[in-house]
Amino acid sequence: MERVGTPEEERQAGPVLPTSLESDSSKRTSWGFLITGVVGGALLTVYAVATPFITPALRKVCLPFVPATSKQVENVVRMLRHRRGPLVDIGSGDGRIVIAAAKEGFPAVGYELNPWLVWYSRYRAWRAGVHGSAKFYISDLWKVTFAQYSNVVIFGVPQMMPQLEKKLELELEDGARVIACRFPFPRWTPDHTTGEGIDTVWAYDMSAQRGRGGRPNQEWVGQKNLSETAGLQASSSETRSKLLDVE
């Protein structure tokens, strides 16, 4: 005969949930953990992929990734005809300029700040069969010296062109050629131009840009700055003396 508990015992034991309700509650908890994990993983993936693209935009002067058109690549290759020596693409993006140059026989290097694009470029070079002559490196263009390159390609933006113009003029040899795409340099006069609109390409030969003055060097620039500073100091002293004489 089944024993029936007293009212006091039933109150202490509390309500007894059916087995089906306990199972549903456990399933809901499992689904909650699963959804949280999926959402968290997705957000982490988006962050990891997007950060290399967003970070350059936070810099004072950024070089955004805009893929070169097939016509732009064709125009760059045209400007490289009868040229020799190593080539560098400043801000190489997905590597199409470097790969095209390597196919033309140039030892080509691309510098890019976005690691995803660098890895993708290396894969594309391997697929194209030019991974031996097309190299890609993760680096900020302002931290790289370009003195060893005879051919320089840049897809720039207006804000960076004046500063880059000065950097290249200091570092490149007289025989080097700079090929600018989308935007020309502000002070240099192009020796060759091809294409129209967004596909326009400007070529600058360093020997022509410098004229008969030859290649400037860091020592000359330093002396020039010192001379300018000394001149300003002398002018300031002379002005001060005149003011004292008046008094």
From Swiss-Prot:
Protein name: ATP synthase subunit C lysine N-methyltransferase
Entry keywords, A to Z: Acetylation, Membrane, Methyltransferase, Mitochondrion, S-adenosyl-L-methionine, Transferase, Transmembrane, Transmembrane helix
Enzyme class per UniProt: transferase
Subcellular location(s) per record: Mitochondrion membrane
Single Gene Ontology MF annotation: protein-lysine N-methyltransferase activity
Region (Required for mitochondrial location): 51-85
Annotated gene: Atpsckmt
Comment on protein domains: Contains an atypical, non-cleavable mitochondrial targeting sequence responsible for its localization to mitochondria.
Tissue: Ubiquitously expressed.
Membrane topology label: Single-pass membrane protein
Function, in words: Mitochondrial protein-lysine N-methyltransferase that trimethylates ATP synthase subunit C, ATP5MC1 and ATP5MC2. Trimethylation is required for proper incorporation of the C subunit into the ATP synthase complex and mitochondrial respiration. Promotes chronic pain. Involved in persistent inflammatory and neuropathic pain: methyltransferase activity in the mitochondria of sensory neurons promotes chronic pain via a pathway that depends on the production of reactive oxygen species (ROS) and on the engagement of spinal cord microglia.
